[in-house]
């Protein structure tokens, strides 16, 4: 979309944050639990809300700084990786390649490879 809109003077920025230390899950998330997804949702939530994992997350202010930079610096840069954990994941994605990275993430979060592309 960035290529198409550029001809109209519209810039696109993609912010890719990692985890963000907030209480969002505790106060806002309604997973709409369905029995078919309960095991999957519980495993995923257990990983992302683990205190050790959460210690690697960025503060909201750190992410806001990246958003502000993307919006104001005037560079022709599409992707902004925000947070140390996001940068590590992005580096792993580049190293492994997209398909191997997706399989590794599926294994970590769900215990098996993705069922559909």
List the predicted regions and their residue ranges.
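Conserved alpha-helical elements of the SDR catalytic core
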Residues: 1, 5
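SDR active-site lid
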Residues: 6-77
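Short secondary-structure boundary/capping segments
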Residues: 29, 96-98
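Short-chain dehydrogenase/reductase
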Residues: 78-89
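A transmembrane-helix-recognition feature enriched in membrane-embedded lipid enzymes
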Residues: 87-96, 104
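Non-catalytic terminal and boundary segments that flank Rossmann-like NAD(P)-dependent oxidoreductase
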Residues: 101-117
């Amino acid at each position: 979309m960035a290529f198409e809109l550029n001809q109209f003077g519209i810039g696109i920025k993609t912010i890719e944050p990692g985890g963000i230390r907030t209480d969002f899950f505790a106060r806002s998330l309604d997973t709409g639990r369905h029995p078919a997804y309960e095991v999957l949702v519980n495993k995923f939530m257990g990983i992302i809300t683990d205190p050790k994992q959460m210690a690697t997350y960025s503060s909201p202010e750190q992410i806001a700084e990246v958003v502000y930079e993307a919006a104001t610096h005037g560079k022709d840069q599409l992707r902004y990786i925000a947070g140390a954990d996001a940068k590590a994941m992005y580096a792993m994605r580049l190293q492994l390649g997209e398909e191997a990275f997706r399989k590794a993430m599926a294994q970590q979060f769900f215990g098996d490879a993705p069922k559909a592309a």
